[in-house]
Amino acid sequence: MAFCSEKIKPKMIKIAVVGDVHDQWEEEDGIALKSLGVDLVLFVGDFGNESVDVVRRVASLDIPKAVIMGNHDAWYSATEWGRKKCPYDRTKEDWVQEQLDLLGDVHVGYSKLDFPTLNLTVVGGRPFSWGGPDMKFADICKQRYGIGTVEESADLIHASVKGAMYETIIFLGHNGPSGLGDRPEDPCGKDWHPIGGDFGDPDFAEAISLAMTENKVIPLVTFGHMHHTLRHTKQIIRKRVFRSPEGIIYLNAATVPRVVENVRGKLRNFSLLQMEGGVVVKVASVWVGDDFNIASEEVLYQQPDKVVQPV
């Protein structure tokens, strides 16, 4: 007896990546995400200088999400000069811990979060990263996670990969991995004096490499920290998307400021991705207006020979 078989089309997943927030998060941002119809939201951190109230608003967002903390999220705790400027009594309060408590399992720094309905796991890189070849200002990682070296950090990130429920893994970092170029305009290129150099995180790169050797499906590595507007020139902006020979999409989502105002009102930036069958087929930077419709869209990547619906 012959059976008629029909190929099942993979589910299209829509993901929003929110770049460095820097205190620019309002209720309207959540409404905008609802309007965009996303299945998952990824936050690359830097909500503000230990901005507990901003993190509280993000934590209340009722859309599946994952978050990693940035260097600004431990601004008054990670460095000696930051501690000198701390606006609160650190013997009585800990705003870093308050943020982590608000986020709970949603914070994936040195951790992971499984999304059964999407059949994927989000694995976080090193939280509170300042970027660069060394673990700069990393005492906070030693205090909170017992991590003191790049090798230990890579191993801890990799442990989350090994604990992932799903073969499809999205990596979420505050700063991106090393290996994406050493020009100042590259995704993690150093754009301050002395100009040039790879400022990516080597521990993040090593963990991704280990996951690749284990044949994990890695459609996306996304991060922020290195703002798109360059310090040394205004003639160009930073390269935002890199596609590796293996087909991994590396996305720097750090559009700063992510909320701007014009005569028509506010525009809110999101990076939108469409993923199908474990592959990113489209990446766009969009600005959403006060009517919660897309006011402008810039396509940053589209899979060759793929017809993709507008975001």
Spans of model-derived segments:
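N-terminal active-site segment of His-dependent metallophosphoesterases
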Residues: 1-66, 73-83, 303, 311
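Active-site-proximal beta-strand elements of phosphoester/diester hydrolases
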Residues: 12-22, 119-133, 170-174, 248-255, ...
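Glycine/small-residue-rich loop that forms an oxyanion/phosphate-binding "nest" at active or ligand-binding sites
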Residues: 77-111
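Active-site neighborhood of phospho(di)ester-bond hydrolases with catalytic His/Asp-centered motifs
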Residues: 17-20, 40-46, 65-72, 108, ...
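Active-site environment of divalent metal-dependent phosphoester hydrolases
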Residues: 22-28, 48-52, 72-79, 129-133, ...
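Active-site-proximal segments of metal-dependent phosphoesterases and phosphodiesterases across multiple
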Residues: 7-11, 167-217
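Binuclear metal-dependent phosphoesterase catalytic core
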Residues: 3, 8-11, 116, 210, ...
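Binuclear metal-dependent hydrolase catalytic cores centered on His/Asp/Glu-rich metal-binding motifs
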Residues: 116-169, 194-200
